[in-house]
Amino acid sequence: LKCHNKLVPFLSKTCPEGKNLCYKMTMLKMPKIPIKRGCTDACPKSSLLVKVVCCNKDKCN
């Protein structure tokens, strides 16, 4: 699985063993601007300020 791991969308990395989800965190007030991206084993929870989107396809975040 390859996930974007920087704020700029064209940089990606191959996820290590066991981390088979990509995630993207955005501020709820500014949903177009990602604040964090990467690989994860379990989808982080969204909060009052941050929305988290997870997916399992290459570069889907």
Curated annotation (Swiss-Prot):
Keywords: Cardiotoxin, Cytolysis, Disulfide bond, Hemolysis, Hypotensive agent, Secreted, Toxin. Disulfide bonds join C3-C22, C15-C39, C43-C54, C55-C60. Expressed by the venom gland. SUPFAM superfamilies: Snake toxin-like. This protein lyses red blood cells and has cardiotoxic and hypotensive activities. Belongs to the three-finger toxin family. Short-chain subfamily. Type IB cytotoxin sub-subfamily. Pfam families: Toxin_cobra-type (PF21947). The keyword Secreted applies. InterPro entries: Cytotoxin_Cobra (IPR003572), Snake_3FTx (IPR003571), Snake_toxin-like_sf (IPR045860), Snake_toxin_con_site (IPR018354), Toxin_cobra-type (IPR054131). One of its GO terms (molecular function) is toxin activity. GO terms for biological process: killing of cells of another organism; regulation of blood pressure. It is found in: Secreted. It comes from the Eukaryota. Is classified as a P-type cytotoxin, since a proline residue stands at position 31 (Pro-31 in standard classification). This is Cytotoxin 1. GO terms for cellular component: extracellular region.
